[in-house]
Swiss-Prot record:
NCBIfam families: PRK08008.1. Catalyzes the transfer of CoA to carnitine, generating the initial carnitinyl-CoA needed for the CaiB reaction cycle. Also has activity toward crotonobetaine and gamma-butyrobetaine. It holds the Pfam family AMP-binding. One of its GO terms (molecular function) is crotonobetaine-CoA ligase activity. Keywords: Ligase. It comes from Escherichia coli (strain SE11). Its EC number is 6.2.1.48. Signal peptide: none annotated. It comes from the Bacteria. This is Crotonobetaine/carnitine--CoA ligase. InterPro entries: AMP-bd_C, AMP-bd_C_sf, AMP-binding_CS, AMP-dep_synth/lig_dom, ANL_N_sf, CaiC. Gene3D superfamilies: 3.30.300.30, N-terminal domain of ligase-like. The gene is caiC.
Length: 517
């Protein structure tokens, strides 16, 4: 089934400008409270100017351009400006340091970088010490260093005409983006995303939350992440809705932003829900227009119920990863929801549970979650310049091995158990980190929790818990272990406890477990 009809991203924006014109398309709020608004017509013009800027700097179809930016209008301009001329965006996690950023530059073959003064010193060092193909840097800030090969993004953009100067032939199968995975367990891999992928993501994600053109979709997720791009931005734009992009998440400011922009859809991860719950209760907690809160793993039922009750919202669960582009398993609009299920397979997808020999398992049995899609259309095309890694996870007929464990019930509802790499082998028993974390997270003194397996000469692995306490709380080892013994099987009780001020996380809020082992 082809729901795109040969329309690439250039055609999408030209059509959106014609159809929605002066309707608000994009609102960006900076951490300093500066708000920029663009209509669909104005945004398309800014995208065209940005495309022309890249063309004047020698960027042509197939060239790679890296973006190292926090959430800002320039990210949106560059994303679609590059797509309009057939160039390829390479977003870099804005929290990465020199070595990691240099590695992505080298492995993506990016020849131009758009960044801000905040990150520029790091790239000066990269240019001096690392072998990359980078030949020019555009800075989004007004003040510029007196360096060769550096120019002002804003000044160059504002000099460009609002109509597109370079429009090479485009196909929906053309690559629009190479998005490097967060790499919590190994080196990041470049996920190749096509024009078709992004167009499909927009329609699919709009369907998933029944998005309309009078909706306002607010997100604080980072723009360099697949959730922001494909679950939020592409959905909002494809439906002609208003997309609100907040620069950075603040638990204190979040509900005020939801109310100020009259948001009807937003998205949350567990870290956000937990930090929102520790904010002082307010009479305004339920004063909002949210219809759906898109939610991504993992949360205990007690935490979910408390959040929904306090704020008067419901969670729409969505399960996916960079390689699936969208939440390929999730709750459906208008359908029943069955917590803690992650939902059912969405349209255009098949899903099943397989054993270690790649054989389908019956309902109720735990195995690997596998998804069938169409590479380059409904799932990623490949890993960039890495056919071995591609072949490891993607079968020739479109079956994708997620590396996650779960099971399915008789009605087709799927249940997530854990990442395979997060299963602890303890004395012959398999222990799910997520299961333990959900239990421990219900302790009233604990704000955040992660458990990992550490080497044990007798039991294969021992379990260690890292916890962050709520402000002003203290927790003794005796109290912690007693709580665990009362709430889980004996073989699941952690052997060690470490209390920390925070936990290492990547840009999408996922805990980087390898930093704790």
């Amino acid at each position: 089934m082809d729901i795109i009809g040969g329309q690439h991203l250039r055609q999408m924006w030209d059509d959106l400008a014609d159809v929605y014109g002066h309707k608000t398309a994009l609102i960006c709020e900076s951490s300093g409270g500066v708000v920029n608004r663009y209509s669909y017509l104005e945004l398309n013009q800014e995208i065209n100017r940005t495309a022309n800027l890249f063309y004047t700097l020698g960027i042509r179809k197939g060239d790679k351009v890296a973006l190292h930016l926090d959430n800002c209008p320039e990210f949106i301009f560059c994303w679609f400006g590059l797509a309009k001329i057939g160039a390829i965006m390479v977003p870099i996690n804005a929290r990465l340091l020199r070595e990691e950023s240099a590695w992505i530059l080298q492995n993506s073959q990016a020849c131009l970088l758009v960044t801000s003064a905040q990150f520029y010193p790091m790239y000066q060092q990269i240019q001096q010490e690392d072998a990359t193909q980078l030949r020019h840097i555009c800075l989004t800030d007004v003040a510029l260093p007196a360096d060769d090969g550096v120019s002002s993004f804003t000044q160059l953009k504002n000099q460009q005409p609002a109509t597109l100067c370079y429009a090479p032939p485009l196909l929906t199968d053309d690559t629009a983006e190479i998005l490097f995975t967060s790499g919590t367990t190994s080196r990041p891999k470049g996920v190749v995303i096509t024009h078709y992928n992004l167009r499909f993501a927009g329609y699919y994600s709009a369907w998933q939350c029944a998005l309309r053109d009078d909706d306002v979709y607010l997100t604080v997720m980072p723009a360099f992440h697949i959730d922001c791009q494909c679950t939020a931005a592409m959905a909002a734009f494809s439906a002609g809705a208003t997309f609100v992009l907040v620069e950075k998440y603040s638990a204190r400011a979040f509900w005020g932003q939801v109310q100020k922009y009259r948001a009807t859809i937003t998205e949350c991860i567990p870290m956000m829900i937990r930090t929102l719950m520790v904010q002082p209760p307010s009479a305004n907690d339920r004063q909002h227009r949210l219809r759906e809160v898109m939610f991504y793993l993992n949360l205990s039922e007690q935490e979910k119920d408390a959040f929904c009750e306090r704020f008067g919202v419901r969670l729409l669960t969505s399960y996916g990863m960079t390689e699936t582009i969208v939440g390929i398993i999730g709750d459906r609009p208008g359908d029943k929801r069955r917590w803690p299920s992650i939902g059912r397979a969405g349209f255009c997808y098949e899903a099943e549970i397989r054993d270690d020999h790649n054989r389908p398992l019956p309902a109720g049995e735990i195995g690997e979650i596998c998804i069938k899609g169409v590479p380059g259309k409904t799932i990623f095309k490949e890993y960039f310049l890495n056919p071995k890694a591609t072949a490891k996870v993607l079968e020739a007929d479109g079956w994708l091995h997620t590396g996650d464990t779960g099971y399915c019930d008789e009605e087709g509802f799927f249940y997530f158990v854990d990442r395979r790499c997060n299963m602890i082998k303890r004395g012959g028993e398999n222990v799910s980190c997520v299961e333990l974390e959900n239990i421990i997270a219900t302790h009233p003194k604990i704000q955040d929790i992660v458990v990992v397996g550490i080497k044990d000469s007798i039991r294969d692995e021992a379990i260690k818990a890292f916890v962050v306490l709520n402000e002003g709380e203290t927790l003794s080892e005796e109290e912690f272990f007693r709580f665990c013994e009362q709430n889980m099987a004996k073989f699941k009780v952690p052997s060690y406890l470490e209390i920390r001020k925070d936990l290492p996380r990547n840009c999408s809020g996922k805990i980087i477990r390898k930093n704790l082992k």
